[in-house]
């Protein structure tokens, strides 16, 4: 009897990813905002270390933006330029308007790559990380952005 339930559980776990309808992204981009944690449960906040000093801060556990909203990626001498779709533009606008003085934490593949203090509202849907990223990461982000554009065009 236990063996049957165990096998049924394994079968269910094996089928869940197929039922989800998509594969996980090859690269993750998460943009979080610093929070005080007041009035929030421990499930709503996470601790993270931010460069350069390695200070520990609290961020909202659910990201404000992710690779799902990404539609353009370019790298030049000024850094990595990220362009977000309409939803991402609205979210970035709201986050930067409502959280002046807090840190915005940009995480790529689990690594904090940029953590500026929000001092201006970003209303054009473009975020620049002011340093170069490894070409392999840039290429993966560009692939995700292109896939998002194709998906939007089919809708």
Residues of each region from the PLM?
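Hydrophobic h-region of N-terminal signal peptides that target proteins for export
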Residues: 10-18
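Structural signature of multi-pass, alpha-helical inner-membrane proteins
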Residues: 2, 19-155
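Sec-dependent signal peptide recognition
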Residues: 2-8
């Amino acid at each position: 009897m236990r063996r049957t339930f165990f096998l049924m559980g394994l079968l269910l776990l094996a089928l869940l990813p197929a039922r989800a309808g998509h594969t996980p992204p090859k690269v993750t981009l998460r943009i979080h905002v610093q929070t005080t944690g007041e009035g929030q449960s421990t499930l709503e906040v996470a601790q993270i270390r931010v460069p350069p000093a390695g200070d520990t801060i609290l961020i909202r556990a659910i990201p404000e933006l992710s690779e799902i909203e990404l539609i353009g990626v370019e790298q030049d001498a000024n850094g990595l330029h990220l362009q977000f779709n309409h939803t991402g533009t609205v979210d970035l606008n709201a986050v930067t308007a409502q959280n002046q003085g807090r840190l915005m934490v940009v995480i790529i593949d689990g690594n904090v790559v940029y953590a500026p203090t929000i001092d201006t509202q970003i209303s054009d849907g473009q975020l620049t990380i002011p340093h170069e990223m490894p070409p392999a990461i840039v290429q993966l982000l560009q692939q995700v952005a292109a896939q998002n554009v194709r998906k939007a065009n089919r809708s």
